[in-house]
C-alpha cells in the first residue's frame, strides 16, 4: 500500500507499455494501494492499467478497505479475486470457496440485481461467465479447457447469491468430485 505501492503499480504499467509482449500477461497481486487512492488518482491509474492491459488479482475484502473493483472494471481493467490457500494467513475468514468470495464481493459492492450477481460469477471462475452482457453464450465453447463446477443452482446469479453447493468438479477433463465422493 501507500506511496511505494503506487510507485510500484506505475512502474509495472510503464514496463508493460514499453514492452507490448507483457500486455495482457501482466497482473499485479493484491494492489491494495488502489483502495486508498483519491478518486482522481484512481481514475488516472485505472486508465493507465487498461491502456497497458495490466490486470489486478486481489482479495475481497482486506481488513476495512474495499478494493475499487467497480471502477477498475468500468475502465476495462481485468480483475480477478483469489485466496492464497484454504488457510489464508493474510485474512483468516472464509473457507477457500471462491463462490463464497464472489458472494462477499456482491454483498460488499452492492451488486443485487440478477444481472449484477451473474457478473460476479467471474470472481469464482477465473473470469469465465456463461453469458456476455448482451445474453449471448460465450462459455463453454468447443475447444475450451474442460474445467467445470456443477452447482445446485438454476442460474449464475443464484449460484453467487446462495453460495450453491458444489455437486461436481471436473479438472482438465477428469472428474475430481461427484456429489460427495472424491475421484482423485
Regions found by a protein language model. Name each.
Residues 5-6, 65, 91-95, 159:
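Alpha-helix N-cap/helix-start motif
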Residues 9-12, 41-44, 71-72, 94-97, ...:
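Short, glycine/charged-enriched secondary-structure capping and boundary segments
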Residues 139-184:
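C-terminal cap of metal-dependent C-N hydrolases
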Residues 1-67, 87:
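Active-site core of metal-dependent hydrolases
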Residues 15-26, 70-153:
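His/Asp/Glu-enriched, well-ordered alpha-helical/loop segment
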Residues 30-31, 59-60, 83, 153-154, ...:
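Fold-independent oxyanion-binding glycine-rich loops
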Residues 5-7, 37, 91, 154, ...:
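Active-site-proximal flexible loops/turns
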Amino acid at each position: 500500500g501507500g506511496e511505494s505501492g503506487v510507485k510500484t503499480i506505475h512502474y509495472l504499467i510503464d514496463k508493460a507499455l514499453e514492452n507490448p509482449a507483457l500486455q495482457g500477461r501482466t497482473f499485479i497481486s493484491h494492489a491494495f494501494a488502489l483502495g486508498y487512492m483519491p478518486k482522481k488518482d484512481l481514475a488516472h491509474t485505472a486508465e493507465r492499467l487498461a491502456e497497458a492491459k495490466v490486470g489486478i488479482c486481489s482479495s475481497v475484502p482486506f481488513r476495512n478497505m474495499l478494493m475499487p473493483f467497480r471502477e477498475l472494471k468500468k475502465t476495462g481493467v481485468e480483475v480477478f479475486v483469489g485466496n492464497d490457500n484454504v488457510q489464508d494467513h493474510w485474512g483468516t475468514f472464509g473457507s477457500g470457496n471462491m463462490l463464497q468470495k464472489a458472494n462477499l464481493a456482491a454483498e460488499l459492492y452492492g451488486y443485487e440485481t440478477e444481472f449484477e450477481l451473474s457478473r460476479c460469477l467471474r470472481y469464482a471462475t477465473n473470469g469465465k461467465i456463461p453469458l456476455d452482457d448482451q445474453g449471448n453464450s460465450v462459455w463453454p465453447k468447443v475447444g475450451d479447457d474442460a474445467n467445470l463446477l456443477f452447482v445446485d443452482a438454476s442460474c449464475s446469479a443464484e449460484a453467487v447469491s446462495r453460495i450453491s453447493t458444489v455437486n461436481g468438479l471436473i479438472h482438465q477433463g477428469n472428474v475430481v468430485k461427484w456429489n460427495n465422493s472424491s475421484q482423485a
